[in-house]
């Protein structure tokens, strides 16, 4: 139907041009009426003619295998103009009127081209719902906010997905999705014989994958620890497939969140001289042949509160490594991160948050662990015990090997270390025993200032000036 307003005269011309009507009304009032019912009006006869035949309908289209490939999301723009799409509604009953267009759409005879509807029950929930596919005539569109107004007059909630492209092939695929007999509850409703289930098109969906399934398969074949940026730019194939995929980033992030929650079982300290192989051992800790280093291992930087971001973000790795550690992590946080038998705490990742999902913490340090939190332990020596009992293994890397040669690992000559776990366990809650142990095997600066300097815990700095009134740790 072609409608145009010229000043105060409105012309109504039928599509076959056999009827002609005139009426007089103020232009502003007429425009307000059109805006209220949400019908988009063509400005001239050439625009009308261009929409009476959809050129894409005449072009062959490949079979569509997933109805989600044909549908989009409305997005935040509630004034978005809609011509066709899939409605899902949860009506209060199974009365046939819920399937009919006049229940939902005013003036349906004037604006509808296709309408089909059917009751279904959810496979998982068993809840009754209605699937409706509608397509408006070429000269008509409605805004989403108006559709929402019409639907919510009768029900409180609904889901709507607009059709990406209203070609014949895509339209038939969505019609088939609504009318498929295997999920029907009762008979479907088809308005004015405007469409029908097509078995040939329905069968063709099994001959290949839809794009969404292709994307899912591509993502699932990659490591779940990969960041979205790394996954997209992995190859030309990935870039072509994933560059414009809006939901893929969240899908990949949810893979990490879906991993089973681990419980912390090991807290390991590797301390001693520099260059003796501590960091190399930490990076290889508990490695497995079928597991990549990136999937297993994460090095924690204490220079910031965040646990990385983007490609450097923590992403569910099971081994967390603190390198060059001297107490930089807040003591309260460290206790949570090393709580044996419990899952890791939530942490901040740039742009989001994440639960730590590790089972092992490895510390490498040039400092004896008795000095890591000297400020905390000087104020309250009883705070040493919660830390001491969390540690399950302590390995000391001396500067020299037993034969007097330098302790530098090489091919065929692995790092030399001494297992001091029994001594560590024997400390119990006695901080003084730990201090004496440090004095005997790995001397450290004579005193520790409470000035917050250096890269260590607040209060840890190196000095040669004695202060006998302060507690001696080493």
Swiss-Prot record:
Which superkingdom is the protein from? Viruses
UniProt short sequence motif Nuclear localization signal, positions renumbered to this chain: 248-255
- InterPro entries tied to this protein: Helicase_SF3_ssDNA/RNA_vir
Subcellular location, record wording = Host nucleus
Q: Which residues form a coiled coil?
A: none
Keywords in alphabetical order: Host nucleus
Task: Return any one Pfam family short name.
Answer: RNA_helicase
Instruction: List the GO cellular component terms.
Output: host cell nucleus
Spell out the residue ranges making up region: Disordered.
455-474
Question: What role does it play?
Answer: Plays an essential for the replication of viral DNA. Presumably cleaves viral genomic dsRNA replicative form to initiate rolling circle replication.
Name the record gives this protein: Replication-associated protein
Which organism is this protein's natural source? Avon-Heathcote Estuary associated kieseladnavirus
